Amino acid sequence: MLQGINHICFSVSNLEKSIEFYQKILQAKLLVKGRKLAYFDLNGLWIALNVEEDIPRNEIKQSYTHMAFTVTNEALDHLKEVLIQNDVNILPGRERDERDQRSLYFTDPDGHKFEFHTGTLQNRLEYYKEDKKHMTFYI
């Protein structure tokens, strides 16, 4: 039986650069660092970085796959400034209805996509129930 997410692992090309990103941008606490790995605690979530130097990374740019973090509206504005000050690659956001709340998409040094999002699953479901009549809801 599944009990929850155990950890999330990202393949990185430069461990030092990635450690700096995860500490400075995501405010993750570095727990251990090896020659080719690092582990972080991000508000109780175990984040693992493993160095893989010679793998293709172009497909990352072609996918919408990402990890999203919940933030407040006030924090989103501050976090955008942090991203800008640290020369983080900010992605153009997709067009969205204001009922879908606010988001800011960006990448880590290896192109993994992240999102700061001000909404909740409940917000999203309520919006979809109002506006997306083609959808089937099971709750």
From Swiss-Prot:
Indicate which residues the UniProt annotation says bind Mg(2+): 7, 66, 115
What are the record's GO terms for cellular component? cytoplasm
- Any idea which GO molecular function terms this record carries? magnesium ion binding; transferase activity, transferring alkyl or aryl (other than methyl) groups
The keyword Repeat appears for this protein: no
Q: Where is the VOC domain?
A: 4-119
PROSITE patterns for the chain = VOC
Family per UniProt? Belongs to the fosfomycin resistance protein family. FosB subfamily.
Assembly, in brief, is:
Homodimer.
Q: Which purpose does this protein serve, as stated in its record?
A: Metallothiol transferase which confers resistance to fosfomycin by catalyzing the addition of a thiol cofactor to fosfomycin. L-cysteine is probably the physiological thiol donor.
Instruction: Report what the protein is called.
Output: Metallothiol transferase FosB 2
Name the source organism.
Answer: Bacillus anthracis
What lineage is this protein's organism placed in?
A: Bacteria, Bacillati, Bacillota, Bacilli, Bacillales
